[in-house]
Amino acid sequence: MKIKVLHMNRDLFEINMAVLEKRSHFIAEKIRKIEIDGTIMSENAQNGMEILCINDRGRKWCLNSSWNPIAASEFFAKRYSIRLYGVYFVFGFSDGRYIRELLKKCDDTNLLVVCEPNLKIFAKACSQFDLQDLLQEDRIIFYFPELEDKEGAFLQEIIDYTRIKLLEFCILPAYDILYHEECERYMDAVLECMRNATVNKETHFAFDRLLPQHMLWHMKHMIFYSNIQQVKESVLKKDIKDVPAIIVSAGPSLDKNIYLLKKAHGKAFIIAVDASARTTLMAGVRPDLLCSVDPNSPDRFFTGLDLDDIYWAGNNWTNPEILKKYAKHIFYYGYYGNTWNEVLQKELQYPFPNVAPGGSVSTEAFMLALMLGFRTIVLIGQDLAFTGGVSHTKGIGDALGDNDEYIKSRQIIEVEGIDGEILQTDYQMWFYKQWFEKAIRFYKDEVRVIDATEGGARIEGAELCTLEEVIQKECTKEMDMYALEEEVPPMFSEACQKKMLKKLKSMRTDITDFEKMIANAIQEQQKILTEIQKEPQDTARTAIALQNLMDDNKKIESNAMLSYISMYAQKEEYALGDSIYADENLTPVQLVEKSLALLKGYQKGAKLFLEDFDQIIMNDKDPINN
């Protein structure tokens, strides 16, 4: 078989790039800049078709069959039973033939998320093969880890609980060996998003209507405050290479070393989580940022504390009552639905800042420190275990009730402590421990993580150090972070604030329009249900009716208001995920009945959303800037 170094077919390459450009200018430009080298070759298979090969580890690896690449691709696709609404996470792109054959088995309800770990392979495939059909295919999402700095955030947009039973991995031949670590990272990221989706389900059920109400309040409130991106821009003007960020969490070991933290003030960026506020402030430490994201963060965390000069970080879930009562300076970030985030981006001329969720206020604080540009992050009070049989720092007091009763109520797991001893933790803290370990692995080239908790569970990948040693070795450069924060203005001028408030209120029309769309869809689908229940059934007419139903539902799914209204219809959406998406044996009548149940959930949700919108957004008597 003839082997040759692959040279660029510039005309074909540019044809493919022109198609890709329409989907992502950023990706197309990055691929155009890739330099061709001799590590990737082309080889003629036995049937004369060209395939890609790569030199790695002292040998040649074929990325498709050296006998018959089409037959091999067809055989690969036959392994997978494609289900309605299935989402397939494919690892590897090769020459595109495997993807093309897999796509042939899919319908309009399916999605392929194709991860190519080596951009050079993709670039050379674009120069060697006509990939226009794949590059413009809406059912394919291309994912390149080399270009994505927020892997979890990207995947979280794709994975939701309703389809959690319909997710499947498809790994191309040779890729699991050539890119074993990258493959594991991809799979771990997907699995973590699935866990997050399950946790989010329980969270939404627990808080129900509270979360969208919080979000609406913040959508209005933020107009008069600053955002965390503004802080980042101010920080980047300074040389912070030798300045660490210290995350102060509320574990029991915080009581051991909090008295030392005052020595780090002005030489580190100190982020305290809300539950650690009392212990931190009582030790004479004024944190540079107080992070609060719990929808039910209790007032007892803050009662009697002097918080007038404290800067807060808040997102769409933060308890508004706490901010109303205690916060005078707020830096916002988070996700406020597609519509409002797009309005913010258009006005600000940059994407509204957000971080990948981790499930706790400590993980949020970690991601904020990373986002702000700090490359040494120190953890204190991050026990992630019941150290000494205690759940939290003494500063919390009775905020969580009796300590022993609280621990007894938890699902207990055993973990290794920093000194090798076995400690008790609960499932929730174990989950956060896993999150930190994954984050440390993922960002290993960007950040150094030091665990100066001096107790608690061992966090794999974090350096162990005492807080005294951290202060001596890492906190050596003076930097007035408070003065830097004081210089950050509100994100909008006074005139722009009025304009943004007007834009926010204009969303009311979108809500009422959505209500009308849902009412019409329900009416039409009730007609369909009546029609297909008639005997004898007309198979052709039933197929047309079901197609019309799917078309109606697609229009509803693409409506921007759905991201808000679905927050009020969580039970209906999750019930749909547990039945219609997972049960392939539903009759046409059952399909329509399930669809109607969901639409009626949306109809109810739209009514509730409009009630909250009028009470929170349209209510001019409610003071905002307090």
Regions found by a protein language model. Name each.
Residues M1-A245, P252-F269, R278-M282, P298-D309, ...:
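N-terminal donor/sugar-recognition subdomains of glycan-related enzymes
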Residues L111-E116, L135-D138, A268-A272, R286-P295, ...:
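Short hydrophobic/aromatic-enriched beta-strand-loop microsegments
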Residues E116-P117, S276-A277, G284-D294, L372-G395, ...:
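Glycine-rich phosphate/pyrophosphate-binding loops
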Residues A125-S127, I258-L260, M282-V285, S292, ...:
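Short acidic, glycine/serine/threonine-rich loops at helix termini
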Residues I158-T162, N315, Y326, Q349:
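Acidic, glycine-rich flexible loop/linker segments
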Residues D294, T303-D306, W317, K324-Y326, ...:
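Beta-sheet-dominated scaffold domains
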Residues E321-L384:
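Active-site/ligand-binding-proximal alpha/beta "capping" segment
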Residues A356, A365-I377, Q382-R441, D445, ...:
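Catalytic cores of enzyme domains
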